[in-house]
Each structure stands twice: as structure tokens, then as C-alpha cells.
Curated annotation (Swiss-Prot):
It comes from Escherichia coli O157:H7. Its EC number is 2.7.-.-. GO terms for biological process: lipopolysaccharide core region biosynthetic process. Keywords: Cell inner membrane, Cell membrane, Membrane, Transferase, Transmembrane, Transmembrane helix. Disruption phenotype: Decreased amounts of the 1-O-P-PEtN form of lipid A. The gene is eptA. One of its GO terms (cellular component) is plasma membrane. Belongs to the phosphoethanolamine transferase family. EptA subfamily. It is an enzyme of class 2 (transferase). This is Phosphoethanolamine transferase EptA. The keyword Transmembrane helix applies. The lineage of its organism: Bacteria, Pseudomonadati, Pseudomonadota, Gammaproteobacteria, Enterobacterales.
Length: 547
């Protein structure tokens, strides 16, 4: 009995190819077909036929690819690859509403082990285990009967390819205009079609990475200090805090009814309520905000081998330090002193390879005390990073309850999810306030200033979308509108004639973006170069005396 159960089932090659093609193209593309139904109403027989033709085309394409690969005995490994990739893509698309594109592949490559662990849920393991791993094992377990005639096998496979090609041509002849209109008006649809979405996105990522090995492009080689800032005995110290996954609409400084920024509300900061990010993922936004390229003309491949604003500031003679608690600076700090404080794994501050952002202050007091000359310190926070929001803040910051204390955020109620996310912002408020107080403690030695700017926002289940990383053109504002604030010591305002009342009024009426960071940092630190654009410097119009 057991022997009979364990006996390998057998199929002829053609049947195996058809079965594998059906599973990959139909069963692993449920997410794609669901999205098609949202864009294509089945309100007429014609639209019904257009929709029904799509599985036919998907099946035919995969059938052709697998059949061609069988001539090289690659049909099993290729089918297994398609199954594993398709199962993973479908899970993340259906669970989090993501899009598989180059940015998402970059996110996957940049994901730390701790972040990967945080994404692992029982649902994920079961889904990928059954639809991916088990299906791939079954594809390998099924025995393919040897062909009785090699010529007959070749002819059958050739006929199989021909029929698939004819089906594709028939659909094209009948519905080409419908397909062209549907995919032209819904360009992101194709990014849900597996396994082509993962293959195209991976190739695009590889092409961009290959260009990153080009020689370094130097910019701002004319950089020098403004004499007004260089000739004073009192030195200048600026802290830039790069936020992670903080969305503007949940900042109480932005008008959010909940008090998520109780400390910053008392710090006399200038908050900029209309600030847009450069991208919807860290891998895009961080290198973009430190580059001299505006979002509309931003080129990822160039940013990977071109200097940024920190290089220019350092070249002008300012000490630069980057403290990282978010898995790396994505190239923005490659040529300045930097350290991964997460790796310190400090007790009471770190959990499963991730740390609370307070770890960023470890050794910072000593660094400032020993600092000779002007300085810029960048603190790269983990902020509200997905999806284990409840691990981003210590227990004492659990202000809003009940919370979503799981990485299966889609299983939590809206109230639980928002409560947990808002608690991360209460902790962000604490971190930024702590940095301001640190600067205040050193005002006897330095003229101080601080900038906080988040890399991108976050979706919390609105319209079935979670996390971030959607293509910019279709991403909701919750992923693109980010908090930005500026704190200037009274000494800075007096010494460099900056009118804070002017800044407050300007902040409420003007629209800003991460494009402003490059020239604002140069102006804030008094670095002059031809790359500086006064129109992008937030402080420029509120300086009483021209520098």
C-alpha cells in the first residue's frame, strides 16, 4: 500500500509540459487576473471574451518557453524556477499590494537578515511552502515517460509550439486594440504578471548595477567655505536625521489630531507640511536626496557612481560622520566616515539584529566633545520600518492601544495597525527631540542646527495597500508625502541673520521636496560651489543679509 502511494506518477513529456504551463500561467497569476478585473469591467460579452483570452495568452507563452527548453533538457529546472518565483511574487502582491519592478528588486537585495526574518509569517511559510516549494518538488517528482520515437517527440513538441503561436496570433487579431488600450491605460498591470515581472525587474536591476561600476564622477571640486562661517571662533555643528517610513499625514505637527509629536511641538521647529519624496523606497529616495539631481531628472545608475552633497561638504573642510541604523546608506556615505551602529548589538536596545534608534547616540557625546572644526552628523534611523512596527519603539512608548504586535499586519484591525504605527512616530518625536537637546548642550562651543527629513511614507491598508515601494506614478500620497522640519538655535538665527518668522510663513505656503536638501545643506553649512542653487535653498529667501 505504502509502496503504491510512494510510486512516482508518470506522464508523457507533452502532458507534463501542458500541466506545468497551466500551473505557472494560471494558478500563479490569480493576483494578475484579479487586477485585470478591476481595470476591465465585465459588462459586455466582448469584455468577457477579452478577459478569457488572457489566460490563453499567458498559458501559450509559458507553454512555448517550457517546450523550447525541453529540447535542451532544461524544462524541469526552468519550470521549478518559474514556480518558485511566481509563488513568491503572487504572495507579496496579494498580501501587501506591491508591484514587482526594479525598485522592489533593489529593496529585496538591500534587505537585511533581520528585515527578512520580520517578513516571515506562518501564512507566508505555508503559502510559499505549498504553492512554491511543494509544487516545484511535485514537478520534479513526476516521472516523464521516455519517448517511443525521438522524431515523434520532436514533431509533437513542434506542433505544441505551433498551436500556442496560432492561439496568440488569433487573440492578437481579435483583441489587439483592447489589449493595447488596457495596458496603455494601466501600465502597472504587466508588473503583476508572473514570472515575467520578476525576470524583467531583475534584469533591469542588473543593468543598473552594472553601470554602477563606472568611474566615479566628481562634482563640486570648487567647494569652499563662506568666510562668514569660517572666520569665527565658534564652530558650526549640524545634525541631519534621515527618517524611515514616516508619513506626513500622521505627524501632529502636520495637523494630525493625535499627539504624535508632543516634544517637537515645544521645540520651536519649522515644519514643512507640503514636502514630497523623491521615491517610495529607501533604495531610491536616499541616494536621490543626497544627489544634485532633481527627481524629474534623477538617474539611479548615475547616482551610484557620482559624488553627492556629503562629498562636497567634506571637500570644503567640514567633518562628516554618518551613523547608520537602517541597513546602509545606499551609497550616500561611501566616501565619508560612517559606522553601522546596529552591529554594536547593545543590550536593551537591540532585538533580533535590529535596534531602537536611540543606539544612534552611542558614542556621539564623546565624538562631539573631541570634534575640531565644523561638523555635520547624519543619523540614519530605522524609524517606522515595515512590517514589525511594534519592534520600532521601547515599551514605554506604547502610547496608543490596542496595538498590532505581529508581522502579519494584514490580519490586524485598522485601529491596531494605526495605533502601532503612530507609536513609532511618538518614538521618532523622542529621537529628534533628543538630538535637539544634544545640540543645545553644546551651544557653548558650536552654533547649531538640525534637519529632519523622512525618506518616504507608508500605506497602512488604505485601498488594500500596505507598506511602500509602489511606482511613483501610481503610489498614493501616503507613500510620497513626508515630514520635514528644521531647527535653528537662536545663535544660528542671530549669527547668520535668518528670520525664523519668515521661514514659518514660507513653510505654510510653499511646496518642497527632497530636491531641496542638496542646496539647503550647502547653504546651512556655508559651503559655496557652482552646484549650489539658491532657489532650492529653503533658508535663502529668509536671510536678512546676503552672504
Amino acid at each position: 500500500m505504502l509502496k503504491r502511494l510512494l510510486k512516482r506518477p508518470s506522464l508523457n513529456l507533452l502532458a507534463w509540459l501542458l500541466l506545468a504551463a497551466f500551473y505557472i500561467s494560471i494558478c500563479l497569476n490569480i493576483a494578475f487576473f484579479k487586477q485585470v478585473l478591476q481595470a476591465l469591467p465585465l459588462d459586455s460579452l466582448h469584455n468577457v471574451l477579452v478577459f478569457l483570452s488572457m489566460p490563453v495568452v499567458a498559458f501559450s507563452v509559458i507553454n512555448i518557453v517550457l517546450t523550447l527548453s525541453s529540447f535542451l533538457w532544461l524544462n524541469r529546472p526552468l519550470a521549478c524556477l518559474f514556480i518558485l518565483v511566481g509563488a513568491a511574487a503572487q504572495y507579496f502582491i496579494m498580501t501587501y499590494g506591491i508591484v514587482i519592478d526594479r525598485s522592489m528588486i533593489a529593496n529585496i537585495i538591500d534587505t537585511t537578515p533581520a528585515e527578512s526574518y520580520a517578513l516571515m509569517t506562518p501564512q507566508m511559510l505555508l503559502t510559499l511552502g505549498f504553492s512554491g516549494v511543494l509544487a516545484a518538488l511535485i514537478a520534479c517528482w513526476i516521472k516523464i515517460k521516455p519517448a517511443t520515437s525521438r522524431l515523434r517527440s520532436v514533431l509533437f513538441r513542434g506542433a505544441n509550439i505551433l498551436v500556442s503561436v496560432l492561439l496568440i496570433l488569433l487573440v492578437a487579431a481579435l483583441f489587439y486594440k483592447d489589449y493595447a488600450s488596457l495596458f496603455r491605460n494601466n501600465k502597472e498591470l504587466v508588473k503583476s504578471l508572473s514570472p515575467s515581472n520578476s525576470i524583467v525587474a531583475s534584469w533591469s536591476w542588473y543593468s543598473h548595477q552594472r553601470l554602477a561600476n563606472l568611474p566615479l564622477v566628481r562634482i563640486g571640486e570648487d567647494a569652499h567655505r563662506n568666510p562668514l562661517m569660517q572666520n569665527e571662533k565658534r564652530k558650526n555643528l549640524t545634525i541631519l536625521i534621515v527618517g524611515e517610513t514616516s508619513r506626513a499625514e500622521n505627524f501632529s505637527l502636520n495637523g494630525y489630531p493625535r499627539e504624535t509629536n508632543p516634544r517637537l511641538a515645544k521645540d520651536n521647529v519649522v515644519y514643512f507640511p507640503n514636502t514630497a519624496s523623491c521615491g517610495t523606497a529607501t533604495a531610491v529616495s536616499v541616494p536621490c536626496m543626497f544627489s544634485d539631481m532633481p527627481r524629474e531628472h534623477y538617474k539611479e545608475e548615475l547616482a551610484q557612481h557620482q559624488e553627492g552633497v556629503l562629498d562636497i561638504i567634506q571637500r570644503a573642510g567640514i567633518n562628516v560622520l554618518w551613523n547608520d541604523n537602517d541597513g546602509g546608506c545606499k551609497g550616500a556615505c561611501d566616501r565619508v566616515p560612517h559606522q553601522n551602529v546596529t552591529a554594536l548589538n547593545l543590550p536593551d536596545q537591540c532585538i533580533n539584529g535590529e535596534c531602537y534608534d536611540e543606539v544612534l547616540f552611542h558614542g556621539l557625546e564623546e565624538y562631539i566633545n573631541n570634534l575640531q572644526g565644523d561638523g555635520v552628523i547624519v543619523l540614519h534611523t530605522i524609524g517606522s520600518h515595515r512590517p514589525t512596527y511594534y519592534n520600532r519603539y521601547p515599551p514605554q512608548f506604547r502610547k496608543f492601544t490596542p496595538t498590532c504586535d505581529t508581522n502579519e499586519i494584514q490580519t490586524c484591525t485598522k485601529e491596531q495597525l494605526v495605533n502601532t504605527y503612530d507609536n513609532t512616530l511618538v518614538y521618532v518625536d523622542y529621537i529628534v527631540d533628543k538630538a535637539i537637546n544634544l545640540l543645545k548642550e553644546h551651544q557653548d562651543k558650536f552654533t547649531t542646527s538640525l534637519v529632519y527629513l523622512s525618506d518616504h511614507g507608508e500605506s497602512l491598508g488604505e485601498n488594500g495597500i500596505y507598506l511602500h515601494g509602489l511606482p511613483y506614478a501610481i503610489a498614493p500620497d501616503s507613500q510620497k508625502q513626508v515630514p520635514m522640519l528644521l531647527w535653528l538655535s537662536e545663535d544660528y538665527q542671530k549669527r547668520y541673520q535668518v528670520d525664523q518668522n519668515c521661514l514659518q510663513k514660507q513653510a505654510q505656503t510653499q511646496h518642497y521636496s527632497q530636491d531641496n536638501l542638496f542646496s539647503t545643506l550647502l547653504g546651512l553649512t556655508g559651503v559655496e560651489t557652482k552646484y549650489y542653487q539658491a532657489a532650492d535653498d529653503i533658508l535663502q529667501t529668509c536671510r536678512r543679509v546676503s552672504e
